[in-house]
Design a protein with these regions (language model features):
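A conditional alpha-helix N-cap/helix-loop micro-motif detector
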Residues: 4, 124-127, 216-219, 244
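Generic hydrophobic, helix-prone segments enriched in Leu/Val/Ile
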Residues: 11, 15, 99-109, 116, ...
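Ligand-binding beta-strand-loop-alpha-helix segment within the catalytic cores
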Residues: 76-168
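SIR2/sirtuin-family catalytic core signature
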Residues: 1-22, 28-32, 37-38, 42-43, ...
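A residue-level signal for conserved active-site and pocket-lining positions in enzyme catalytic cores
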Residues: 25, 134, 155, 188, ...
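Conserved nucleotide-binding/hydrolysis micro-motifs of P-loop NTPases
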Residues: 28-30, 158, 192
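Short, well-ordered, mixed-charge alpha-helical segments that flank or form enzyme active sites
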Residues: 159-162, 194-198, 244-245
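Active-site gating loop/helix substructures
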Residues: 113-120, 166-231
Length: 362
């Protein structure tokens, strides 16, 4: 049995015994058209600064998110700074939360804070196979006997709650008693449901200050829930990049505890596209510029005897370096994650996720 098969077998056993916890990241919600946190911040920032001129574009949120993505590829400003500037723009907490709700669910609304807020569970699952597979795992659960023990989500949205429909669940975004017989869904960064009646900013983690405040409070309900779950059940992380600093800190703390942990993460295998001839030529020219710099500095005086600029072997040399770095990079990522007590389950295509999740129920 290879490592991946062993991981899936462990997840199946945990599900059968009712001891499997799910950790959901932005990758789960993007399949339904919701923005990731970085695009959410920029889209809110753009529309806040140009509210009147951008109002017609609220009818076409895809353009706002596409522009945010374009800006992300070119901006050097840390998003934490942008988020802080955005928050300072709003004097009224209610206005900020309404704008966050409108931007988060822009694809569900008609641009005027109304729209399709009554979504059929079947429709939302068929349009997002990963969410559909997660929903099936939750629906197959019997509290205390089999299935999912709890869901910890780092997303604001209520897509899973909508998909679960009449299955008994409890959405939790602050310290509160657990309801017996209901699947707990912990929103540790806050909860902004689609069918909203009241939004409170103190319940969400949005700015860098709020993030640090949440991270440093070791006894906050959110941190305690995560530590208890990471150390007391088998965990599967879905749609998470594993780059969240607070989560890595918690994983590191749990890995030092005198308990046996069993956590897994579904991660896309890094793909390094081979450079095209033009890119290879640019890399070669850059390498030559370094050699010339060495010669001028006097650090290397015999490079011409060991390096032939007319030799075409540099193509293979560059490609072999890239391939070796790629191979070692995957191994190193696996090693670092396992040091944190997380066993990666690599996949090549996102279409594999629903299949892997479905196999847990088999």
């Amino acid at each position: 049995m290879n490592r991946a098969d062993g991981s899936m077998d462990s997840l199946r056993k945990a599900y059968q015994s009712g001891n499997l916890s799910l950790y959901l990241g932005a990758g789960v919600s993007v399949g339904s058209g919701l923005p990731t946190w970085d695009k959410l911040v920029l889209a809110m920032y753009f529309s806040a600064l140009s509210k009147h001129s951008l109002h017609p574009w609220q009818l076409y949120p895809s353009y706002l998110f596409a522009t945010a993505e374009w800006h992300l590829e070119r901006s050097n400003e840390p998003l934490e700074i942008t988020a802080r500037k955005l928050r300072r723009y709003y004097k009224d907490d209610d206005d900020f939360m309404l704008h966050l709700w409108e931007t988060l669910y822009a694809g569900f609304l008609d641009g005027f804070s109304t729209g399709n807020t009554a979504i059929a569970p079947l429709a939302i699952c068929s349009g997002n196979p990963t969410l559909g597979a997660i929903t099936q795992l939750c629906r197959g659960s019997v509290s205390g006997q089999q299935g999912i023990r709890s869901v910890i989500t780092y997303n604001y949205d209520s897509l899973l709650e909508i998909a679960l429909a009449d299955h008994p669940f409890q959405a939790i975004c602050k310290s509160m008693p657990l309801a017996r017989g209901k699947l707990p869904i912990y929103h540790v960064h806050g909860y902004v449901p689609l069918n909203v009646t009241e939004l409170t900013e103190q319940d969400i983690v949005f700015t860098e200050d709020q993030y640090h405040q949440s991270a440093k409070d070791a006894y906050s309900w959110a941190n305690l829930v995560q530590i208890q779950s990471l150390s007391g059940s088998t965990g599967l992380m879905i749609g998470l990049s594993m780059s969240d600093r607070n989560m890595r800190r918690l994983l590191d703390a749990v890995s030092q505890m005198p308990v046996e942990t069993n956590n897994y993460a579904l991660l896309k295998e890094p793909v390094w596209k081979k450079p095209d001839p033009a890119e290879l030529q640019r890399i070669n020219e850059k390498a030559l510029s370094y050699f010339y710099r060495y010669e001028v500095s006097g650090l290397k005086t015999d490079w011409e005897t060991r390096f032939n600029t007319a030799d075409d072997g540099w193509h293979e040399q560059i490609i072999s370096i890239i391939e070796e770095v790629h191979r070692v990079d995957v191994d190193q990522q696996t090693f670092i994650l396992e040091q944190l007590g997380v066993h990666p389950i690599w996949f090549k295509d996102y279409d594999e996720i629903p299949e892997k999740l479905a196999s847990i129920r088999a």
